[in-house]
């Protein structure tokens, strides 16, 4: 497998003379090629150490792909059709040997990563369709369902360790603090939930926000919690101040359907308009765009183990890869320049505004001509 997340050594020019002139050298791309599925993927996860990407689609099928920047080397390793309905989430275990999946069919599956064999099935894990999944450690996991139910599981035991229903709507996303003590839940009822999974008790619900909370992430070294919403607003909470928001700001997006942290200050959001936005937290700025799904809603985002690639799934049935190198060099300051209203978002990758992989390299010269600069005026809106 091509070490995609490692820099390739420079080739000796003398070796090139020994190559058969009739053989073209394999093309090395900035990112792996798009993966085309037969149905949109609603679950997406990178392997913790290897160049593998798992996807679960709305037909209930689960796939594992080996990806590479060498053209023609990205390929499917195996697929599984054990779920009866849509696969909602996929997560690799910490050691990368297992893949856990959950589904609208209310089941939890544990698969062997090497062969794709089903090792364990919990058929009726919830009384309602399961919508979200989070692994706590190699044995413990948390699931959330469409009616607001949350269950804590130990794979070495039968039945859930904890079963709570404090939310009134579906559990959209979950996050865990570094100590693996507090579970944070984003729900369709507009509330952020806090659960102590060490003591197996409910702590509190935040005040309801406008619209569904669709995603949750810890930022600023755990000092802030960011929640995306169906109204296109990011809500910020102080750690240990979960009752009410400390800040908020609206993106020029119909919704925020998914969200993934890239650094402690930067995150990426996927929206119904198909645009993947890079957002800085405090100061709150929309830095630019790293890519798009050509007007099709973005369903899920995931960051590779090396941090170089962002993967996205959309309703166009494609899995796309985006280069995060340029985004990581962006510096955001507190000074605000006036930005032309309605202007295009800054492109943060060579194919950010391309609708086809064929055009991936056409913007490279333009982007390279721009020296790295401090971004200070890319916000769509002021924070309250």
UniProtKB/Swiss-Prot annotation:
It is found in: Nucleus, Nucleolus; Cytoplasm. Disulfide bonds: none annotated. The lineage of its organism: Eukaryota, Metazoa, Chordata, Craniata, Vertebrata. The gene is Wdr55. Residues 9-19, 375-384 have a biased composition (Acidic residues). This is WD repeat-containing protein 55. The keyword Repeat applies. Pfam families: WDR55 (PF24796). SMART domains: WD40. Belongs to the WD repeat WDR55 family. Keywords: Cytoplasm, Nucleus, Phosphoprotein, Repeat, rRNA processing, WD repeat. GO terms for biological process: rRNA processing. Nucleolar protein that acts as a modulator of rRNA synthesis. Plays a central role during organogenesis. Residues 1-33, 362-384 are annotated as: Disordered. PROSITE patterns: WD_REPEATS_1 (PS00678), WD_REPEATS_2 (PS50082), WD_REPEATS_REGION (PS50294). GO terms for cellular component: cytoplasm; nucleolus. WD repeats lie at residues 36-75, 82-121, 125-163, 166-205, 208-247, 250-289, 293-332. The modification Phosphoserine is found at residues 354, 383.
